[in-house]
């Protein structure tokens, strides 16, 4: 268990410990209803400071098999739903905050390589027998594991837009080639 794959860190508990918390666990009723459908790929694109990271932490705490969070969720809105235990702590979860990958990766252009390498290393700790020796692609690794075990993974990408945001910021804050030639 590591930083990305089935982390034992329950960041959602910190959210619940805060003085201000608005229960959005009702969203889990929806995500549970689409898990085994073609609608299972969900993109939560909202403005900054809209609670996306808290939602990502909630999804991780709810679905991850590395955590035991029944006591937490049974007291919240999702706990009132008929089948809230059906998917609770039943999945291998890979939770990646892209923003925190840029620096250790050595820059935005190395993030995918960094994620592939590190997540596959973590997967090997649990699924060594299921992975071919030279596996270097995360989609390939997940496909191999799923084919051999039948297990499903939940992949949560937080701050996925940081690469776009940062590139746009650089584009609009860097001097244009014309401006650079004038300043010489």
Spans of features found by a protein language model:
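Single conserved hydrophobic/aromatic residue that forms the stacking wall/gate
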Residues: 172-184
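Phosphate-binding site recognition
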Residues: 1-174
